[in-house]
Amino acid sequence: MDFLNSSDQNLTSEELLNRMPSKILVSLTLSGLALMTTTINSLVIAAIIVTRKLHHPANYLICSLAVTDFLVAVLVMPFSIVYIVRESWIMGQVVCDIWLSVDITCCTCSILHLSAIALDRYRAITDAVEYARKRTPKHAGIMITIVWIISVFISMPPLFWRHQGTSRDDECIIKHDHIVSTIYSTFGAFYIPLALILILYYKIYRAAKTLYHKRQASRIAKEEVNGQVLLESGEKSTKSVSTSYVLEKSLSDPSTDFDKIHSTVRSLRSEFKHEKSWRRQKISGTRERKAATTLGLILGAFVICWLPFFVKELVVNVCDKCKISEEMSNFLAWLGYLNSLINPLIYTIFNEDFKKAFQKLVRCR
């Protein structure tokens, strides 16, 4: 996104020399982040394209997100690095307009993709049967197209207002002199998608938790109706033990109290039932914790990366007396860019199919 920079023309040669190590460090660090973002998103895109098992409408949204984040890495980050290191814009206003357009559009599109993915997952859980019919490649394509169209509509007005004021040739920024422009762009690009994502993921977690409990209760109810409360292996084992035990007793001692024998068998079954119930509770608890962890990572990364930047954009541009340093402004912008590196990691790291696809790509199989 846009941020302020100052010219270094007034600095002496000695001052520039003293600042050189820090500039080199910043340049290498940011270049490393850009390279990592490019590589990881490329892997996600390649994995989805070449792996037939990943050809699913839900993964098309992931692929489109990866394409968007890839564009941020190759079209936005490099220009930003040059701008930060040089401390002035040297590529002319035409390139500046193109860079700002791509910057705002791609960053907005990346955020809106997260909303689309949240909506897709919400419908897949809460309306599984009906949505399974609608969840087609065409449907995914329509969602992706809508996301890009909305992103363009959100990003274009700030660029139009940019040309209403005068800009120096050595700077490439959007001056938010219009409060309406600031509110429109920040709420459209972040605050509204954030509210939507928070609501959807809260409902997803509640729905998933309820679904686990219903399935668990349904399995137990079915087994109790059938008179079975054991795992298949445990059931066979118990039948074998109880049958041989009864047969042995009946042959060796005709006066055996069979009520006691059946009591022993019931006791064994009760123990297996308790063990099975405990195992299921453990599995259910593990699933819920995993779901909570995944959702927590998704929301946490998104909020940590983008919230500071958009708070700054809203406060600084609405409040005339509020100022922020150039270094902090740059840091907040790159904290937002960092989300393009984190996105492919979070959305694929918990998926075994993606892990296997990555391994095949790395091994060139």
Swiss-Prot record:
Q: Which GO terms describe its molecular function?
A: G protein-coupled serotonin receptor activity; Gi/o-coupled serotonin receptor activity; neurotransmitter receptor activity; serotonin receptor activity
The membrane topology noted for this protein in its Swiss-Prot or TrEMBL record is: Multi-pass membrane protein
Main location group? membrane
Instruction: One Pfam family, please name it.
Output: 7tm_1
* Coiled coil residues, start to end: none
For the Cytoplasmic compartment, the record's topological domain ranges are 50-59, 120-139, 203-291, 351-365
Q: Which residues bind serotonin?
A: 103, 107
Q: Does the keyword Repeat apply?
A: no
UniProt similarity note: Belongs to the G-protein coupled receptor 1 family.
UniProt name for this protein: 5-hydroxytryptamine receptor 1F
Recorded source organism is Pan troglodytes (Chimpanzee)
